[in-house]
Design a protein with these regions (language model features):
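Metal-dependent amide/peptide-bond hydrolase catalytic core
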Residues: 1, 17, 157-164, 169-170, ...
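Glycine/charged-rich beta-loop-alpha catalytic/anionic-binding loops adjacent to active sites
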Residues: 84-98, 182-185, 300, 335
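Short beta-strand segments
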Residues: 71-72, 127-129, 152-155, 180-182, ...
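Glycine/serine-rich anion-binding loops at beta->alpha junctions
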Residues: 75-79, 92-107, 187, 313
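Phosphate-handling active-site elements
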Residues: 89-91, 111-126, 209-219, 361-367
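Acidic/histidine-rich catalytic neighborhood of metal-dependent amide-processing enzymes
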Residues: 101-170, 368-369
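Acidic/His- and Gly-rich active-site-bordering loop/insert found
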Residues: 1-96, 117-120
Length: 369
């Protein structure tokens, strides 16, 4: 499984697929479809972001009862201009999308093949979306898979300080706010008093949002203004502008409180607040503990339950599928940068983790309650 995943990761990374490029999405979908098991059903599902290319669903059936969902995404962050073909460097495979998350997609394909011949399997489906990196619509796929026994998501993996393999069973909720300010433009030299600065209003809004950050509090809220754009000329009071803020907390309710705290007018400028995207929180520590214990015993080494602040589509499925485990991809680094990489050795260790989880899931009824 690992050796095949190494070859397939390289083939996937060789295709540039930045989020929102429909032509590139069709190219990467074509590559993945060619790697699907011979007897698999291949479907296209409408993407949550309607202007993006349709998502890809690959399914295999068996005579048993267990239903397993495998999840990943095909879109990446790095633009075509910054893209380069994958390169090997010492023990790494370097290239845009290696860790986030084409290495994980390759392992997910291996997991689908491993499930194909299991007598306990009723259905295994691999869902690969085209808008995870930037989504403007409401996530569309949760209800379709609500009757599945388990969801395994193949975002990048990690190890503990002691070197043990870790998986992700807890994630923060995440949201992005867009604030649009409307002030009044005026000549900054001859009549600045006639203007209402959208820039100053947004700067004040940014300070307000940042002041609500409470990472040590009960919701572990982080509220971070990240992008401010305002002004068109050096001699004009800015009449408009936009501010983007990244919010993370244990629940969406904490994010909604921040959103509600922003006034509709600041320093004379009107403020419009829009939530551009949102992921629910995920906490599957209790539900996944028996499965992780059973898989660790089969593997002969610990699989550690971990948590992560970054958003993932696993969180959407954790609402409906109690056994949801994320972070099953290879270990790596520099995500969202051109020099992103994976540790090639981790393809082997993570393959072992995935296969142990599948064995425990299919053979041990107690592992899924």
């Amino acid at each position: 499984m690992a050796a095949t995943a190494e070859r397939e990761t390289e083939a996937l990374v060789a295709v540039s697929s930045p989020s929102g490029d429909a032509v590139a999405a069709e190219q990467i979908v074509s590559v993945v479809s060619a790697l699907a098991p011979a007897g698999a059903r291949i479907e296209r599902l409408a993407c949550s972001t309607l202007e993006h290319a349709p998502d890809l669903l690959i399914s295999v059936d068996g005579p048993g009862e267990r239903k397993v969902l495998l999840v990943g995404h095909l879109d990446t962050v790095v633009t075509h201009d910054a893209f380069f073909a994958p390169q090997r460097s010492a023990h790494h495979l370097v290239g845009p999308g290696t860790a986030d998350m084409k290495g994980g997609v390759a392992l997910a394909l291996g997991a689908l093949r491993a499930l194909e011949d299991r007598a306990e399997l009723g259905q295994a489906s691999l869902l690969l979306v085209n808008d995870e990196e930037w989504r403007s619509g409401t996530f569309a796929h949760t209800e379709r898979f609500s009757g599945f026994d388990a969801c395994l998501c193949f975002e990048a993996g990690e190890r503990t300080i002691g070197g043990d393999d870790a998986v992700v069973v807890r994630r923060k909720a995440a949201g992005a706010l867009k604030l649009t300010a409307r002030g009044r433009a005026a000549h900054s030299g001859s009549a600045p008093e006639q203007g209402v600065s959208a820039l100053l209003a947004l700067a004040e809004a940014a300070q307000l949002v940042a002041s609500l950050s409470d990472p040590a509090g009960p919701e572990r809220l982080t509220a971070v203004p990240t992008i401010l754009r305002s002004g068109e000329a050096i001699n004009v009071v800015p009449g408009g502008g936009k501010l983007l803020c990244d919010l993370r907390a244990d629940s969406l309710a904490a994010i909604e409180i921040v959103e509600a705290s922003i006034p509709s007018e600041i320093a004379g400028a009107s403020i419009k607040v829009e939530r551009e995207r949102a992921w629910p929180g995920m906490d599957a520590r209790e539900q996944t503990a028996p499965l992780l214990a059973a898989a660790s015993e089969l593997l002969g080494r610990p699989i550690v339950a971990g948590e992560r602040g970054g958003a993932s589509d696993a969180s959407h499925f954790a609402v409906a599928i109690k056994i949801t485990i994320d972070g099953l991809g290879p270990c790596g680094g520099h995500s969202h940068h051109a020099d992103e990489y994976i540790d090639l050795e981790s393809l082997f260790s993570r393959s072992e983790v995935v296969l142990a989880l599948l064995d425990a899931l299919l053979s041990d009824p107690q592992s899924v309650g």
